[in-house]
Amino acid sequence: MSEQFEHISVLLHESVDGLAIKPDGIYIDGTFGRGGHSRLILSHLGENGRLYGIDRDPQAIAEAQTIDDPRFSIIHGPFSGMAQYMEERDLIGRVDGVLLDLGVSSPQLDDAERGFSFMRDGPLDMRMDPTSGISAAEWLAEAEADDIAWVLKEFGEERFAKRIARGIVEHRENPDKKPLTRTKELAALISDVSPFRDKHKHPATRSFQAIRIYINSELDEIETALNGAVKVLAPQGRLSVISFHSLEDRMVKRFIRKNSKGPEVPAGFPLTEDQIKALGSADLKMASKAIKPSKDELGDNKRARSSVLRLAERL
């Protein structure tokens, strides 16, 4: 059994304050994790309030089951299923706030057995839900060099993607080499084939991020979850999203911007005002500028340094 690891919720108060919680409201914590955000949300709710937590990590589900509160329910599944879960509960268009804390959590990173970190030796797994899908080791044992390079470039913005992919495949095809099954083995290989050293960043940082994102379909999950949030939110309901790297943040920023605009009609196009309105209207409005951690929080938690909070309101 994995040991317990501390998790410090990033932008905790800012993200929960951004929900503008109503005591009798209905809320979703789409990334329960170890429950930091959920517990704070519950502290703001009255006896008629309701909170649904969602997570696909069995360890998160075990933690959620320690919360003995009739206002709280946990759902085991990906947050991309948010709209479906709420439809099953007849809550489409009735939710007052959705919080998403994207990416991998500190306990997942710190637990070597999960295989997320190049800093700790463990099985090369990287699955958010270890009970489903293929592991990173299984994928790397089969994927073509071009496919590996594409993943490293697309999801890690890795400048040496082709060189690293070629190194992985050459290692795999060498009969004198053991298959890559451990995080330290992959990290060492990447270090060996990378020609450039950044004193502030391990050579494997971007590759591990990219492989993790691919294995868990993270960006597709985020896109589906954001669309699901728009569907489940009531008018004036709040969306609070914390991201940790530029790919996530760009996606969230573009989503809010896109859904804050009405239909684009070319200038001079022969439509009446009523016809334009019939095409639809904006779904969201930005509720705040991007929020970053305070100096105090950065001093207490170095993992907060890349985090960004974006808030939107349902129209």
Swiss-Prot record:
One of its GO terms (biological process) is rRNA base methylation. The keyword Manganese does not apply. Transmembrane segments: none annotated. S-adenosyl-L-methionine binds at G35, G36, H37, D55, F79, D101, Q108. Its EC number is 2.1.1.199. InterPro entries: RsmH, SAM-dep_MeTrfase_MraW_recog, SAM-dependent_MTases_sf. It is found in: Cytoplasm. Pfam families: Methyltransf_5. It catalyses: cytidine(1402) in 16S rRNA + S-adenosyl-L-methionine = N(4)-methylcytidine(1402) in 16S rRNA + S-adenosyl-L-homocysteine + H(+). Gene3D superfamilies: Putative methyltransferase TM0872, insert domain (1.10.150.170), Vaccinia Virus protein VP39 (3.40.50.150). It comes from the Bacteria. GO terms for molecular function: rRNA (cytosine-N4-)-methyltransferase activity. Keywords: Cytoplasm, Methyltransferase, rRNA processing, S-adenosyl-L-methionine, Transferase. Its main location: cytoplasm. The keyword Zinc does not apply. GO terms for cellular component: cytoplasm. Belongs to the methyltransferase superfamily. RsmH family. PANTHER family: 12S RRNA N4-METHYLCYTIDINE METHYLTRANSFERASE, S-ADENOSYL-METHYLTRANSFERASE MRAW. Specifically methylates the N4 position of cytidine in position 1402 (C1402) of 16S rRNA. This is Ribosomal RNA small subunit methyltransferase H. It comes from Photobacterium profundum (strain SS9). The lineage of its organism: Bacteria, Pseudomonadati, Pseudomonadota, Gammaproteobacteria, Vibrionales.
